[in-house]
Amino acid sequence: MNIVLLGAPGAAKGTQAQKLVAEYGLAHISTGDLLRAAVKAQSELGIKAKEYMDAGQLVPDQLVIDLVKERLSADDAKAGFILDGFPRNTAQAVTLDFELQNMGLKLDAALLVAVEPEVIVERLSSRRTCKECGYTAPAGTEICPNCSGEMYQRDDDKPETIRKRLDVYENQTSPLIEYYKGHGILKEVNGDRPVDEVFADVKTLLSL
């Protein structure tokens, strides 16, 4: 099964992705991780991406698509994949569909993990992040349980910043949701519940 994962920052869609990976052996393809790995490896695509990132510019869609195509050719993606962080808009979705078709692939579902904005604001503004390893934990956690590093509140986890991020997400993603709805593959799950309840619904929606 090939899935595009949709959801606002803080919707805990990554948690659902991890559970799908663990239970069904799907490849979790995060475009953010792909970009960081390519830059670190100094691959041809990574060097190109770094030029844009260093200049504070968005990495062009085609470059991201090329990274995704490269990743999809890996053996672990043969059983299916979860694409996380791309596409972000309708133009990217159209390009992705075209490239997947050229590879003999198609999307089976666009899974939207939906959570009310104020729930997300409360979730994100109450979390702390480790300065050393990036581990996240609830407010009040001063020492990282993973590596004993110092915990802090990221600037983008402050309520006013979160609301701005959610506005940007809404403006970008609403047309994308309509795009996948029009293609008959949108599956929406209420993410404002315990993780295992959400996952049970995800499996039902995806007929797994």
Question: In which residue ranges do the predicted regions lie?
Answer:
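Glycine-rich phosphate-binding loop of ATP-dependent small-molecule kinases
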Residues: 1-208
